[in-house]
Amino acid sequence: MSRLRRFNRKILSLSSDYTHDGESDQEDVSILPLDTEEQEELIQKFETNAHITNKLYINLLSILYLLYGGLLMILVRKSRGYIKLALLAGANSLICSCITLRYDIVNDYLLFKKFKLRVSNFSINIINIILLVLMAWISFNHVVEDKKTVLCLQVPMFLFWVAVLVKRWARNIEDEIADLRCLKYKYKNA
C-alpha cells in the first residue's frame, strides 16, 4: 500500500524533484508492477480527479454564460431595431450553449398526441448554430451603426466553441479512462 501511495505522489504531483536517468533514493517508485487492486485504486483516483476537474470547469463556464447572458439582456433593453434582435439571439445562444455543456439530453415529447418531437444535444446545437448565424448576419449588416455591440455579439460564438471543446475534452478523458481500465493486467503481490 505504501508503494501505491509513493507511486500516486510521483504521478499526481507536479513536483520538480522527480528523479530521472537512474538517480534513485528511497522514495522512488519501485520497478515492480502494481497488483490488480492497486491498479484499480489508481484508475479510480484518476477518474475522480478528472470528474472533479470537469465539474469545476463546467460550473465556472456556466457562471460565465449566465453573467454574459445577463449583460446581453441589459443591452437588449437599451437597444433598438435589428441590433435588439441580434442581442436576443445571442442571449438565447448562450442559453443553448449552457444547456448542452451541462446536460446530456435525449427526450421525446408528444405534441397534440400525434407528433413526436425528439430533443437531444444535437438538435439544441443545430438551433444554437442557427441563432449564431442569424446573430452574425444581423451584426455584420449593421456594423456601421454600433461597433461596440457588434464586438459584444462575437462573444457568444466564442463561448459556443468553448462549450463544444470542453464537452469533447471531457468525453476524451472518459474514453481514455475506459481504455486504461481495459489495459489492466493481472498481477498479485505476495
Swiss-Prot record:
Main localization category: membrane
The UniProt record lists the keyword rRNA-binding: no
Subcellular location as annotated: Membrane
GO annotations of cellular component type: endoplasmic reticulum; membrane
UniProt KW keywords: Membrane, Transmembrane, Transmembrane helix
Coiled-coil blocks: none
InterPro entries hit by this protein: UCP010056 (IPR016564)
Extracellular topological segments: 77-80, 145-149
Membrane spanning stretches: 56-76, 81-101, 124-144, 150-170
Keyword Metal-binding on entry: no
Bilayer disposition of the protein: Multi-pass membrane protein
Residue spans, topological domain Cytoplasmic: 1-55, 102-123, 171-190
More info: Present with 238 molecules/cell in log phase SD medium.
Protein name: Uncharacterized membrane protein YGR016W
Species this chain originates from: Saccharomyces cerevisiae (strain ATCC 204508 / S288c)
Classification of source organism: Eukaryota, Fungi, Dikarya, Ascomycota, Saccharomycotina
